[in-house]
A protein has these predicted regions:
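Conserved beta-strand hairpin/beta-sheet module of binuclear metal-dependent hydrolase folds
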Residues: 22-87
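C-terminal regulatory/interaction regions
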Residues: 2-11
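Active-site metal-binding motif and surrounding structural segment of the metallo-beta-lactamase
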Residues: 75-119
Length: 119
């Protein structure tokens, strides 16, 4: 039997989780590790922001980086994080809750795009 408000057997809310890819980087393994890597070879890297949502709440996890940082760091910006979020129906101007996992440039670079968010 499920809880009538949550739909889950445990009574906990159910959320959808989306990974939104906004940038990429072509690189070698040695570019990712201090001191290099003796097994050097291609090791591309993708960059994501995340959305965790249900009918009552939307949380954005990390805010990514923008065009200026992408150019300075040699990353390929596929779309801004805000554009990626808009593609799944999330308006950054309306997001109230943002979770920052840590303070690296690729996790917190466009925080100003979330004017009413609580971090």
């Amino acid at each position: 039997m499920t809880n009538s408000q949550t739909g889950s057997p445990s009574g906990l809310p159910i959320y959808e989780v989306f990974a939104v890819r906004y940038a990429t980087r072509e690189a070698l393994r040695k570019n990712h590790f201090i001191g290099g890597d003796p097994h050097d070879g291609p090791m591309p890297m993708d960059y994501f922001v995340w959305v965790v949502r249900n009918a009552q709440h939307t949380f954005v996890v990390d805010t990514g980086f923008g065009a200026e940082v992408a150019a300075k760091r040699g990353r390929t910006l596929l779309r801004t994080p805000a554009e990626g979020l808009a593609a799944i129906g999330v308006d950054v101007a309306q997001v109230k809750d943002v979770i920052i996992t840590h303070l690296h440039y690729d996790h917190v670079g466009t925080f100003e795009s979330f004017p009413i968010a609580q971090f």
